């Protein structure tokens, strides 16, 4: 989905999107129930998933506040979930954030240095360009957020806003 602005090679070398510290708990992707079932049946029957709203999140174990913990689905070859990876992961470093009660924003995480180094105008054009029969990446993200509102992340001040919409 993002290969126009981020090569698979650059993405695979970095993996910063798959590592978390205690301050990143809000960024842990939400796994839909059907994906959680798939993980338990096909990948790791002992995978630790905790209920989160209408979905699940991976349980991350931190020994101290400085420790980094990798997503349990990350291997040397990348994400074992492939096409079944959480929506948050499919569209990262883009996010739907709640700016206030009535406003949602599509933002880009500055943690992804490759993408966030691109001009905001290029990123804005990218997310608003028709992607497939479902519309632009922005349309797809907002549709998903409307269907799964618990996946909307809180707004973080240093995340550049690429699109603003009124919350339905």
Predicted regions and their residues:
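Short loop/turn segments that flank or connect secondary-structure elements
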Residues: 1-168
